[in-house]
Structures are given as structure tokens and as C-alpha cells.
Amino acid sequence: MRKLIYIMVGIAGILGALSRYYLGLTIHEFWHHTFPLATLLINLAGCFLLAWLTTYIAKLNILPSDVITGIGTGFIGSFTTFSTFSVETIQLINHFEWGIAFLYVSCSILGGLIMSGLGYTLGDFLLKKHLTEGDHL
């Protein structure tokens, strides 16, 4: 049965990477500036989703742990991209876009922490609400 986790992570990873790719293309259709908005928005969304998933969905026990791992490690792990963030930052620095690079790094780190905090807070709130409504885990 442990082979199922590899399949779940693999399939979810493919879906996460494709989602990032197509969402990035869509954002680039409307955003034609130096600032790497697509990667920032995708990474911030991933921070929120992973925190919410691990704080709420995983604790409800409504999905098998292999599915939770598939979503977290596979989908969200391949949807977000630290390597693209790093390369884009170096490219900005190499093109002497110091201000944009600083803004990008700041928004990525602080925004990631804020979005993770919001995902955690929402997950915790929903979990407590779920428990107080009489549905116990």
C-alpha cells in the first residue's frame, strides 16, 4: 500500500506543476513589468494553502494520509517554486534592478509568513468551529 503514496505525490506533482505553468502564463498575459508577479502570487497562494491544509484538512481525518501527503508534497510542493524565486532574484540583481529585487525578496519572505499565518489561523478557526458544532474528530 505504500506504493500508493508515490503515485499520489507523482500525480499531484504533475497537476501542481501544470497549474503553476498555466497560471504563470495567464498572469504574464496581463503583467508586462520587470517585477516577477506570477511567481510571487503562486508562492504566496502555496504558503496559504499548505498552512490551511495541515492545520484543518489533515486534522479532520476526512482524507487518507497518503492523499494529504500527495496534496501537500506533490501538488503544493510543485505548484510553489523556491528555485524560480531565487533565479529571478539573481536575474534582477544582475540587471541592476536592486529596488525591485529587494521588494521581491521582502514581499516573498514577509508575504509568505503572513499568508502561512493566515492559512494557519483560518484552518484553526474552522477546526474549532467544526469541533464546537458537535462533530468531533
Swiss-Prot record:
Sequence intervals crossing the membrane: 4-24, 37-57, 67-87, 98-118
Catalytic activity, reaction form: fluoride(in) = fluoride(out)
Location in or out of the cell: Cell membrane
Keyword Ion transport: yes
Binding site for Na(+): G77, T80
GO terms assigned for molecular function: fluoride channel activity; metal ion binding
Inhibition and activation profile: Na(+) is not transported, but it plays an essential structural role and its presence is essential for fluoride channel function.
A GO cellular component annotation in the UniProt record: plasma membrane
Membrane topology classification: Multi-pass membrane protein
Organism superkingdom: Bacteria
InterPro entries per UniProt: FluC (IPR003691)
Entry keyword set: Cell membrane, Ion channel, Ion transport, Membrane, Metal-binding, Sodium, Transmembrane, Transmembrane helix, Transport
Biological process according to GO: cellular detoxification of fluoride
Pfam families recorded: CRCB (PF02537)
Claim: Cell division is one of the keywords in the record: no
Disulfide bonds: none
Protein task: Fluoride-specific ion channel. Important for reducing fluoride concentration in the cell, thus reducing its toxicity.
Entry-linked HAMAP family: FluC
Family of the protein in this entry: Belongs to the fluoride channel Fluc/FEX (TC 1.A.43) family.
Protein's name in the database: Fluoride-specific ion channel FluC 1
Species in which this protein is naturally found: Bacillus cereus (strain ZK / E33L)
